[in-house]
UniProtKB/Swiss-Prot annotation:
Organism, as annotated: Rift valley fever virus (strain ZH-548 M12) (RVFV)
Gene: N
Top-level taxon of origin: Viruses
GO function term, MF aspect, one: RNA binding
Protein name (Swiss-Prot/TrEMBL): Nucleoprotein
Family: Belongs to the phlebovirus nucleocapsid protein family.
Compartment(s): Virion; Host cytoplasm; Host nucleus; Host endoplasmic reticulum-Golgi intermediate compartment
InterPro entries associated with the record: Capsid_Phlebovir/Tenuivir, Nucleocapsid_Phlebovirus
Length: 245
């Protein structure tokens, strides 16, 4: 008969392999959508025009939200026609779509590299503006001002650097969550953070974009230097998050 107590002791004595565990975390991470499938569907529905259409959908997602039918109620005639065409062409959905359906937010997340660059231009049209974020942390990094930014974070950065970037990004997510969800406005920072931490970590640990490419994006955005060290603005935002209420 097995000695279960002894087996328990023997198991506890086994080494903890950091690389192996981190690989499992990436494999088992929660994934709300498949970025590869999103791009596949965009190309399938859009043909030669998919890239230009995707940019339109990203701008809509950033400035108007994820419900195309509702946003059309307050929009110019030309805008309504454009959105209607996108809905029909790409079969855009709202709510909780299946793996094989597109939403505006999925397009923005799947193409996060362009999304984050567009934020620099669109920062004053967002639910939480760049000016508002500057009031919380001077020169707040515009590239961080959308949940899709998490997909650009390199999880292989040194621990302190990675934590600073995620804290800096969380400063925006904290404000964003309270603006778009009135039920969270009276909640503590910890309670609000609990609503965005899982999807943020899922995006960070996804394997759609390599660590090397993510590091290149972060450097191009001016968020880290060649050694992966966060910029002064990122560090300031990280500190602001730690002291935020």
């Amino acid at each position: 008969m097995d000695n279960y107590q002894e087996l328990r002791v023997q198991f506890a004595a086994q080494a903890v392999d950091r690389n192996e565990i981190e690989q499992w975390v990436r494999e088992f991470a929660y994934q709300g959508f498949d970025a590869r499938r999103v791009i596949e569907l965009l190309k399938q529905y859009g043909g030669a025009d998919w890239e230009k259409d995707a940019k339109k959908m990203i701008v809509l997602a950033l400035t108007r939200g994820n419900k195309p039918r509702r946003m059309m109620m307050k929009m110019s005639k030309e805008g309504k026609a454009t959105v209607e065409a996108l809905i029909n062409k790409y079969k855009l959905k709202e709510g909780n779509p299946s793996r094989d359906e597109l939403t505006l937010s999925r397009v923005a997340a799947a193409l996060a590299g362009w999304t984050c660059q567009a934020l620099v231009v669109l920062s004053e049209w967002l639910p939480v503006t760049g000016t508002t974020m500057d009031g919380l942390s001077p020169a707040y990094p515009r590239h961080m001002m959308h949940p899709s930014f998490a997909g650009m974070v390199d999880p292989s950065l040194p621990g302190d650097y990675l934590r600073a970037i995620l804290d800096a990004h969380s400063l925006y997510l904290l404000q964003f969550s309270r603006v778009i969800n009135p039920n969270l406005r009276g909640r503590t920072k910890e309670e609000v953070a609990a609503t965005f931490t899982q999807p943020m970590n899922a995006a960070v640990n996804s394997n759609f974009i390599s660590h090397e490419k993510r590091r290149e994006f972060l450097k191009a955005f001016g968020l880290v230097d060649s050694n992966g060290k966060p910029s002064a603005a990122v560090m300031a935002a990280a500190q602001a998050y730690k002291t935020a209420a």
